[in-house]
Design a protein with these regions (language model features):
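Short acidic-hydrophobic, aromatic-tinged amphipathic segments that line or gate anion-handling sites
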Residues: 98-102
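STAS-typified acidic loop motif
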Residues: 2-31
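Amphipathic alpha-helical interaction surfaces in cytosolic regulatory modules
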Residues: 20-97
């Protein structure tokens, strides 16, 4: 799994590529989000478009990232499609996250 961070205005876009499962990226995502929050970056967009699969441990870590950001007065939004979107729906995570189909829509929502 690969994680890259880029900035668009005040939003940190975390681009994740590859499979996310226990031991394969869940801790890397946690560490990267902690770094961002520690640096004062509290508007975070998780771009998971290039993640073909997430197991329950990885989903739990995404939820934990949301919780950490909220504790700092921040927000985490997600961009997902396909099987990952189905998994989020089954877990009813649409109640927790603002979910978008593309990065541009998510960025536009941050400036509302």
């Amino acid at each position: 799994m690969k994680i890259e961070v880029r900035k668009k205005g005040k939003v940190s876009i975390v681009d994740v590529t590859g499979r996310m499962s226990l031991g394969e990226g869940d801790s890397a995502l946690r560490d990267r989000v902690k770094e961002l929050l520690g640096a004062g970056d509290t508007l975070i967009l998780l771009n998971l478009l290039h993640v073909p699969h997430m197991d329950s441990a990885s989903i739990g870590e995404v939820v934990a990232c949301h919780k950490r950001a909220a504790e700092k007065g921040g927000t985490v939004k997600v961009v997902i499609q396909g099987k990952v979107h189905e998994t989020f729906n089954m877990a009813r995570l649409y109640r927790v996250f603002d979910i978008f189909a593309d990065v541009e829509s998510a960025l536009a929502d941050f400036v509302k």
